[in-house]
């Protein structure tokens, strides 16, 4: 009888794809996949080790699932960034863990299970710079109508606060034809929205083709029959070209949405972070985006409490956010991570002050977001239906301006039944801080 396996994926969408590949490999080798951890013989926890909060979440989940060894569970395997980061130390600190699989070793998951079933406790790290293996299968775990596509792995940016290059290796683009093929397979399975992800999507192609190819990739993806929305996440501001802006503007399938994690606006702090841009360049880029794509939704993320961030720097950041009025904003407190240059900087900001600054900016953004959402009242927008919440009358969905998990939702009332995965026109009638409410317009659905 085949072993049953449960995979728990923590952290970002890029990590989720690694988990989906492990599921594909296990399925290919005849393992029984289960969504119920209590019924599993083997549990794989695909961990995040990016910042302190993510490490704590991963450790807590490992300990929680380790309790199942009192019952049916035979093996507990830790994969992903936490395993890559701490390797043998993790195995020594957590006796309930049977094996560690690094970010360069998940393709060996079957071998790891075989060896641990023989009583060995092993560490399978692998090569974090290995080329992307296009032959590995993948089982999609997101909603059937929406899927992530990882267009590269690794990172060459070396921001001083970030451990990712040490966990994921150098930047490695996938071949364009393989990405197109994956998109077509997803479309054949009913996917309507694809979300392009990487540590840096704007760098796509430079290592393979000696030029940036994100715009060309978007144009090719838009030719895939069945795909209706193409969304781009994780764009570095200094890499957003006029060509990319023109593609977002002119390609009907590319969502009028862009995610640009700027991290700060103070040129002093940006230099300390080793970010290759300045406040003036960020402002110029945002003005160019708004001018060329008038209805574009801009998401960004900010780090507060970076070492050396003075009250003056923070006030500059606050004024910047008030002035720019981002459509979507995530604010994170700086996490002092061992092995990063920023961890050695003087003037580390106290935790209480970091949290206070985060709260101030999120309250500011809440007001900005509400005012922006109110502008949608009376407008008709396209909404991708994601869930039925009241039988045949009320639904949850997302607009082109909302990425899954991180952005808002649209509450939709309908006089006719709608299907999950359907894109419908919705007239917006009310607005909340982050969400919209509206009524379906049924003569134009697809």
From Swiss-Prot:
Residue ranges occupied by any MTTase N-terminal domain in the UniProt entry: 3-118
EC number: 2.8.4.4
Residues given in the record as [4Fe-4S] cluster 2 binding sites: 155, 159, 162
Co-factor requirement: [4Fe-4S] cluster
Source organism, top-level taxon: Bacteria
Record GO terms (molecular function): 4 iron, 4 sulfur cluster binding; aspartic acid methylthiotransferase activity; metal ion binding; protein methylthiotransferase activity
SUPFAM superfamilies linked to this entry: Radical SAM enzymes
Name of the molecule in the record: Ribosomal protein uS12 methylthiotransferase RimO
Source organism of the structure: Alkaliphilus metalliredigens (strain QYMF)
Designated gene of the protein: rimO
């Amino acid at each position: 009888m085949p072993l049953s396996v449960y995979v728990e994926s923590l952290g970002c969408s890029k990590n989720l794809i690694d988990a989906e590949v492990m599921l594909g490999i296990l399925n290919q080798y005849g393992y029984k996949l289960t969504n119920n951890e209590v019924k599993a013989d083997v549990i794989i926890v695909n961990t995040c080790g990016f910042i302190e909060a993510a490490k704590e979440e991963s450790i807590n989940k490992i300990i929680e699932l380790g309790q199942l060894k009192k019952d049916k569970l035979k093996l507990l395997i830790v994969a992903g960034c936490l395993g890559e980061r701490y390797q043998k130390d993790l195995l020594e600190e957590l006796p309930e863990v049977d094996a560690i699989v690094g970010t360069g070793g998940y393709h060996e998951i079957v071998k790891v299970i075989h060896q641990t079933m023989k009583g060995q406790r092993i560490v399978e790290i692998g090569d974090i710079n290995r080329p992307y293996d296009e032959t590995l299968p993948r089982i999609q775990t997101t909603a059937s109508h929406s899927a992530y596509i990882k267009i590269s792995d690794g990172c060459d940016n070396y921001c001083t606060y970030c451990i990712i290059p040490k966990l994921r290796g150098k930047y490695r683009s996938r071949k364009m034809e393989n990405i197109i093929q994956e998109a077509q397979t997803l479309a054949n399975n009913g996917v309507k929205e694809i979300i392009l992800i990487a540590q840096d999507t704007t760098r796509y192609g430079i290592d393979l083709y000696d030029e940036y190819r994100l715009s060309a990739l978007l144009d090719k993806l838009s030719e895939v029959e069945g795909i209706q929305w193409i969304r781009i996440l994780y764009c570095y501001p200094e890499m957003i070209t006029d060509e990319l802006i023109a593609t977002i503007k002119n390609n009907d399938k590319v969502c009028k949405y862009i995610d640009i994690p700027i991290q700060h606006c103070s040129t002093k702090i940006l230099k300390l972070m080793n970010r290759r841009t300045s406040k003036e360049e960020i402002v110029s880029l945002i003005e160019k985006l708004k001018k060329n794509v008038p209805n574009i939704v801009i998401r960004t993320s900010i780090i507060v409490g970076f070492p050396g961030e003075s009250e003056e720097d923070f006030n500059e950041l606050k004024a910047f956010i008030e002035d720019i009025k981002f459509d979507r904003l995530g604010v994170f407190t700086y996490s002092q991570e061992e092995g990063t240059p920023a961890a050695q900087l003087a003037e580390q900001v106290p935790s209480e002050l970091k949290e206070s600054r985060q709260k101030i900016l999120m309250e500011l953004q809440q007001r900005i977001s509400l005012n922006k959402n109110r502008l949608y009242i009376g407008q008709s927008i396209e909404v991708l239906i994601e869930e039925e919440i009241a039988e045949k009358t009320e639904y949850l969905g997302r607009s082109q301006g909302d990425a899954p998990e991180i952005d808002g939702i649209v509450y939709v009332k309908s006089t006719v039944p709608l299907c999950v995965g359907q894109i419908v026109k919705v007239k917006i009638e009310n607005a909340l801080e982050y969400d919209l409410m509206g009524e379906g317009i049924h003569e134009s659905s697809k």
